């Protein structure tokens, strides 16, 4: 690693995206944010679509800026959210904008699918928890409606691959993102075409699956020239953002659980093979593809969504609480005994989150500080419950919980979580998704041998904080 290598990660979320530049030099890894851009769905004729042109322009602005600064890139990688896709026409053009998973057009579709493929059979094949917006339900809904983009499509590309296509003109289907679609047989790690054909879904539009680390191709000649970067290769990283984040967990061995903490919390373990049985289905666990052939066995938990929605209510009331202020408020009511179930469907999309919580606890006299304390304690308790479930499935003893993502910066919640679960919580890195993206590019370039070397380098490069149970937390 004596030569300096530079990689660019585009990390795109459902509301915003950013680009981060990773530098490897002399065995040291560093990272800096290059740009940040909004990502908002478009509403057309009552439908929600992703604004692919806007995202592409943001990519181009970033690449052009790097080129003007004389920065030479070894490669580029892209990660995004899962399930959504775009259709490519036979002439290689975009057949239509990709629909956004927030569009309610798949409401009620799973029940229609189960009339053809029973729920238990679908889970047994794919290992994916049932959610209305899973790709399989989107494709069924579009097929049934005679969607013109899908009807004329020669291929479909999931969002990371679609964005890579805008830069390279090459079409691939990356494994980790495909694994979340609800269409992939988790045992064969290929699309279950027999199942899809029973639903009338076209299988000729599905591309062969490639593994993370596959080089997709160089930037298109006109983009290479326009940006001044030259023919930089674009690499298929772990395209699903959670897969990239889990790749960046700074663990020393397999005996860990992870919590990717943000608006939603994703808690799981990394295992060598899918865990698919009646217990995992009943508990609504999902199996998603990880790097190096691993499986991310996990559960979706409502995360900071509860607090974010309360903040919106309070802001409209003229109370603009900062996050540090919210932490102080919760700490001041640490002994407050009230609890809610964060995953209760009543909290999915209430008109007023504060009022919904008050109704749930049956006490409309709660102060704002007590509500915040209730949310934090309830999340910590829910993490304990799910961790206990995970231990029942894990082929090893879970010894620590790694918290990654934006929520890992919340020291009070980390401490209360450690107290609740009775084991150490290792917090950080915050930018796990982008770091995982960059590390997989470095692995593709031959700078890193495997995920454990990757994790050792991350551990040495980014500070983490360890929270042990029952420690003093009044700092």
Task: Please annotate each region the language model reported.
Residues 1-96, 124, 152, 224-234, ...:
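N-terminal glycine/serine-rich phosphate-binding loop of ATP-dependent small-molecule kinases
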Residues 2, 8-9, 21, 107, ...:
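Active-site core segments that coordinate phosphate-bearing ligands/cofactors
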Residues 11, 98, 102, 134, ...:
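Small/polar loops that bind or transfer phosphate-bearing groups
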Residues 44, 68-102, 129-135, 160, ...:
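Short beta-strand-loop/turn "lid" adjacent to the catalytic site in phosphate-handling enzymes
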Residues 72-80, 155, 208, 393-405:
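Short glycine-rich phosphate-binding loop at a beta-alpha junction
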Residues 79-82, 212-213, 261-264, 400-408:
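Glycine-rich beta-strand-to-loop/alpha-helix junction loops that act as flexible
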Residues 196-212:
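A conserved helix-loop-beta module that forms one wall/lid of the active-site cleft
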